């Protein structure tokens, strides 16, 4: 069946513990997401938001800045309960960036993001995502802009697997890859064994 969600978020963060001066961040977002049935377990996904953020600090510890923009996503997902699930979306983000004592500049990003989940029997699962973005903006894009996407090309991939070993142990592993302007071919492998009592 079709589903529609509309929500509003307003967040504020204030820190006064740093001897160098206080720091204040605020964010507001009005968002909408629709899930429209195409056929069977396949859905059309439409998502968008209007957002703003503001960062200020004492003694100019950070460059005071304001951001106004929008986010849009369009894609298809398929949910087969207990089997293979996937979600693929095209994205376009745009932000207006206003730095203190500077003219407003614009930044935009487009790309595709894919996620999937596969159940392995009753006790295991493997899930992952592969994303590609291209952002075009000023040389120094604040981390709040474009949903955190860095300037230029970004390739990000993540695979996580978990399996239960009996009733008290689980084995988990993660492989993570990131390549963008900030991190050049960053690669991370992590594994853990958890005991449940």
Where are these regions (language model features)?
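Exposed, low-structure sequence patches enriched in small/polar residues
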Residues: 1-197
